[in-house]
């Protein structure tokens, strides 16, 4: 009899998509109120001036303006200013 034996089953074969975390708006970019600036798990970047932090630690803009990343006290802060800020201490 020319039968093929039953093939074994596998427990592999799935791959979840990435969570799409990271920076969404760069330093100096224009944003509107409510725009997501940085998606993260934990507080890698902290909310600065005119920026808020969501339940999932997402940093978002509270006003319409320009994004500015600042380094203060060994932390990186994402702020939003109504006018463009010229500062050499940007950290990204």
Swiss-Prot record:
Keyword Nucleus in record: no
Gene Ontology MF term list: structural constituent of ribosome
Key words of the record: Ribonucleoprotein, Ribosomal protein
One Pfam entry name: Ribosomal_L27
Keyword Metal-binding: no
InterPro entries: Ribosomal_bL27, Ribosomal_bL27_CS
Region of interest called Disordered, as start-end residue ranges on this chain: 1-22
Gene Ontology cellular-component annotations: cytosolic large ribosomal subunit
Any Gene Ontology biological process: translation
Cited NCBIfam families: L27
Record family assignment: Belongs to the bacterial ribosomal protein bL27 family.
PANTHER family reported for this sequence: LARGE RIBOSOMAL SUBUNIT PROTEIN BL27M, RIBOSOMAL PROTEIN L27
Protein name per Swiss-Prot or TrEMBL: Large ribosomal subunit protein bL27
Gene that produces this protein: rpmA
